[in-house]
Each structure stands twice: as C-alpha cells, then as structure tokens.
C-alpha cells in the first residue's frame, strides 16, 4: 500500500544520506553559547514543570520553541514566554516553509519523547506537522536530539513486551543518527 511505499522510499533516501560521504553533522554543545536550537514540545502533560527546570540547561544557547497541537493544550504561550528565554515561540507552521524554517537551526531538540512521537519518527511517518518537521530535519542530516527517559520511566518494568517494542523503536532512531539522551 501507499504507506509502505512511502516508508521504503524514505528509507532509501536515508540510506543514501548514510553513505560515508554524507555523515550527519556533529551535535553542537547546547550548553555553550553560539548554538541556535529549536526546542519542540509535544503534549506530554506530566512533564510540564520538568520542562521549565530543564530548559535552564540551555542558558548559553539561543533557542526557539515550537509547539505541537498537543503541546498547545498543555503549555500556555504567555507562560512559556515568561518562564523561558525563548527568542520565538511558534504555534503554527506549514509544510511549504519547512526547509527554510529548519535551516535556521544547528540542532532540534525534542524535549520529551511521547509514545506517539516515537512511533511516528521511528517509522518515518510524517502525517503530523511536528513529526514531519522532525523527520525532515533528520533527513537533512542535522542533529536531532530527543529525550526518551520520561517515556521509559512512565512504562517502567511492568510491561516487558511494551518496553521491548519501545527499545526497538529507540534503537531505530539511533540507526537514523538521532541522539537519544537522558534528561
């Protein structure tokens, strides 16, 4: 079907990029000055206060924030503006400006990986706008950094089959050149 065809084509494009002559750019040091970072927020509601604590770690970087539709229900734009040093907070975007928009950033950070985002990105599914941007950034071989720790902590050891599936998807992200980091 079309979904499988799109996935096969996208995998072929990624394999072309993965040739030794086209290695991904090294992730800039996000804690130092000079990095221009896009922080993407999804609707992981239980991580709201953690986000405000963790964003301070980017004190030396210039960063913007992009909110998914789910994040717009969790985060108030005015509160984000008052509690962070984000230069810009984006709540709407289009497919047509994707490349131009992403070219401004040295790295994209998905602050908290939701199960939905993990599934979309690891399968190269771009039917949500935020995941489309994340996959496109990954295809362009620029650093994509995600934190899966909250997702892993949420599932815990009680569901081994689910954890195995999640770990396989995280491993696939690593194969694609995504840096999966703890908080």
Feature map (PLM): residue ranges:
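A cross-family phosphate/adenosyl-ligand binding-site feature
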Residues: 1-128, 135-183
């Amino acid at each position: 079907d079309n979904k499988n065809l799109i996935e096969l084509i996208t995998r072929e494009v990624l394999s072309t990029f993965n040739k030794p002559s086209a290695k991904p750019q090294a992730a800039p040091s996000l804690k130092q000055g000079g990095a221009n970072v896009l922080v993407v927020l999804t609707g992981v509601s239980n991580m709201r206060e953690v986000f405000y604590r963790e964003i301070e770690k980017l004190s030396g970087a210039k960063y913007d924030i992009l909110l998914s539709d789910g994040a717009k229900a969790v985060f108030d734009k005015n509160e984000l503006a008052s509690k962070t040093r984000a230069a810009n907070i984006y709540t709407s975007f289009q497919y047509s400006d994707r490349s131009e928009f992403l070219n401004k950033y040295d790295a994209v950070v998905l602050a908290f990986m939701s199960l939905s985002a993990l599934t979309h990105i690891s399968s190269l599914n771009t039917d949500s706008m935020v995941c489309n941007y994340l996959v496109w950034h990954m295809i362009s071989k620029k650093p994509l950094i995600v934190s899966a720790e909250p997702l892993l902590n949420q599932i815990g050891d009680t569901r081994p089959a689910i954890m195995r599936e999640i770990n396989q998807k995280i491993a696939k992200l690593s194969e694609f050149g995504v840096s999966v980091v703890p908080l």
